[in-house]
Design a protein with these regions (language model features):
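Edge beta-strands of jelly-roll/beta-sandwich modules across compartments, strongly enriched
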Residues: 151-165
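Extracellular and analogous surface-interaction loops
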Residues: 75-86, 137-142
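Hydrophobic membrane-insertion alpha-helices, especially the h-region
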Residues: 10-26
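A short tyrosine-centered beta-strand micro-motif
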Residues: 145-147
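Short, surface-exposed beta-strand/strand-loop-strand elements in extracellular ectodomains
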Residues: 96-117, 164
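Extracellular carbohydrate recognition and processing domains
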Residues: 113-141
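A short beta-strand element within beta-rich, extracytoplasmic domains
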Residues: 84-95
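Transition segment at domain starts
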Residues: 31-79
Length: 165
């Protein structure tokens, strides 16, 4: 019995270490895998690594800034009992990296509202990287609708938005 105890303890430690490594790899690798994966973006999963991430709501205006972000985060949720269109006024500036705002409807349909790349040249197809106010229409479906910000590795951005019903 005394010979089996160290083997059992060793096996348990090995299993716990393997589980820990898998969880840590998922926590660090998953956010960088998210950007181009629409199925993951539309899922309930929220996975992001953030440095100096600040979010505040004041007088109906939501402001989100981040020095470095990789992955995705829900920045707005809205439940509606019927299909409705709402206007979103926003300023979005990516100073480093690549980011996009995605509307996720209750049936997990994802719609790209805007996408910016700090490296986009004048001839590249990308939304403007200026901080001028923009506007878009949110076509919300019955149920819970969400807006997520999705960032490639190490993206720095500032976002301010207001949604009118």
């Amino acid at each position: 019995m005394k010979k089996k105890l160290p083997i059992i303890i060793g096996c348990c430690l090995f299993v716990y270490a393997a589980i820990f490594v898998i969880i840590m790899l998922a926590a660090f690798l998953l956010p960088s895998y998210v950007y181009g994966n629409d199925k993951l973006i539309a899922s309930e999963l929220n996975s992001a690594n953030k440095i100096k991430y600040r979010r505040r709501v004041h007088d109906g205006i939501t402001t989100v800034t981040c020095d470095k972000m990789t992955g995705m985060d829900v920045i707005w949720k809205y439940n509606t009992s019927e299909d409705v269109a709402m206007q979103m006024n926003y300023t979005f500036q990516v100073t480093s990296g690549k980011a996009k705002l995605i509307l996720i409807q209750p049936d997990n349909t994802s719609i790209t509202l805007t996408e910016q790349d700090s490296d986009a040249g004048e001839n590249d197809v990308s939304d403007t990287t200026s901080s001028a106010e923009q506007q878009c229409t949110l076509n919300l479906k019955r149920g819970q609708n969400k807006i997520k910000i999705v960032c490639e590795k190490g993206t720095s951005f500032s976002l301010s938005f207001h949604i009118d019903s």
